[in-house]
Amino acid sequence: MVAHDAAAGVTGEGAGPPVRRAPARTYQVRTYGCQMNVHDSERLAGLLEAAGYRRATDGSEADVVVFNTCAVRENADNRLYGNLSHLAPRKRANPDMQIAVGGCLAQKDRDAVLRRAPWVDVVFGTHNIGSLPTLLERARHNKVAQVEIAEALQQFPSSLPSSRESAYAAWVSISVGCNNSCTFCIVPSLRGREVDRSPADILAEVRSLVNDGVLEVTLLGQNVNAYGVSFADPALPRNRGAFAELLRACGDIDGLERVRFTSPHPAEFTDDVIEAMAQTRNVCPALHMPLQSGSDRILRAMRRSYRAERYLGIIERVRAAIPHAAITTDLIVGFPGETEEDFAATLDVVRRARFAAAFTFQYSKRPGTPAAQLDGQLPKAVVQERYERLIALQEQISLEANRALVGQAVEVLVATGEGRKDTVTARMSGRARDGRLVHFTAGQPRVRPGDVITTKVTEAAPHHLIADAGVLTHRRTRAGDAHTAGQPGRAVGLGMPGVGLPVSAAKPGGCR
């Protein structure tokens, strides 16, 4: 009998010299877009490793390059096809190299990917990421490109093997898809209507992660407040309070120190969630809730189904229950038809809300969205000028809020890849419980990514805190042990979005 190892070659039983095993094929996954894609890319990596591939070392040329793409921004197409063009000479020089394109842009463009980049081997969509190893093998065997785009979710990505980027923080998907119809967003047409995982499955995954040493989880959904209305299991009844119950259940998991979630929709944000946030020991005092615009007229045009005063009322109640909460948001500048009066309304809400940080975007026209057909598309120069004014205002507010923390002690979950200048400044970096980025002087070599320290804030900037007072307390963790042992520890955000700008972070995206 002869057994075949798909990645390592053929070995035989019986007489004769042993057959030399061929080296495993290497892979690289390049991720663009939102935190959903980061989660899915960890599954793509897990699938490939389960199939016998191994991660390519930094700086090496991988045998398989996978692009997990985003379709939210206008430049997503140019970015993908530009990167594919850069790989074309490598593909010509090495026909055995394989290139795969997945994610939202692949779901949207489908066969057009091969028309624009005929050297691509595999195109797969958002609903069938589990097919990637099979498609790669089929393309290699048949010498023909494979395009497989499913119209509905075949399997929850969270049920697939995972190769996580971090030993200390993990993404946990609670739902896939979105039932909203924001006019600027293409995501619902690409990821489908919302489907929710069962609470039992989610909590089982969280417990498994904690058993592996994970300290922090981020619950992911396009609209986490809608969780419970579209369970995949028909035996589970609709439950409008399911998300608050899920947060409280996370509080009962021993060893789980931090719980974050992203993103809620203001139209469905309810007081039971605020109560659960305030009363559950490990839910972090942080809320990322997209506003998009402070103008009620623009919110109607966006089909956001809430108005500015409702939004401000929610954050007022959050701050009443959790006074130290850091509240962050998403804002779009230059939506079609936005007047100076509309923009002034956004500035007014930003002043009143006092966000700790804001992810601010210039409106990007996306074919296939209702907003792309609206009159009043604004000149680039007008959008840019408003964008710069908004950034200046928010940075002033962020700096004032961060300066108020100087002299205070802060607990930090130490991270890797969060500090662009850590090597030069001899600092380490991590996230406070409220999501703020903290650069601190360790003063001792024993502190490791995954450990938990406390330190005192000595300086503030709009996007980060500096703590040069030294480490006040240091707790070694199993996550730190795993990082030291060489388990995955690549750059990863501790929950997204956070307050501050790491070197490389997923962009908030999708319909929220």
From Swiss-Prot:
Its main location: cytoplasm. Residues 1-22 are annotated as: Disordered. It catalyses: N(6)-dimethylallyladenosine(37) in tRNA + (sulfur carrier)-SH + AH2 + 2 S-adenosyl-L-methionine = 2-methylsulfanyl-N(6)-dimethylallyladenosine(37) in tRNA + (sulfur carrier)-H + 5'-deoxyadenosine + L-methionine + A + S-adenosyl-L-homocysteine + 2 H(+). Residues 164-400 form the Radical SAM core domain. It is found in: Cytoplasm. It is an enzyme of class 2 (transferase). It comes from Mycobacterium bovis (strain ATCC BAA-935 / AF2122/97). Pfam families: Radical_SAM, UPF0004. Keywords: 4Fe-4S, Cytoplasm, Iron, Iron-sulfur, Metal-binding, S-adenosyl-L-methionine, Transferase, tRNA processing. Catalyzes the methylthiolation of N6-(dimethylallyl)adenosine (i(6)A), leading to the formation of 2-methylthio-N6-(dimethylallyl)adenosine (ms(2)i(6)A) at position 37 in tRNAs that read codons beginning with uridine. One of its GO terms (molecular function) is N6-isopentenyladenosine methylthiotransferase activity. InterPro entries: Elp3/MiaA/NifB-like_rSAM, Methylthiotransferase, Methylthiotransferase_CS, Methylthiotransferase_N, Methylthiotransferase_N_sf, MiaB_methiolase, rSAM, rSAM_horseshoe. Its EC number is 2.8.4.3. [4Fe-4S] cluster 1 binds at residues 34, 70, 104. Monomer. Its cofactor is [4Fe-4S] cluster. This is tRNA-2-methylthio-N(6)-dimethylallyladenosine synthase.
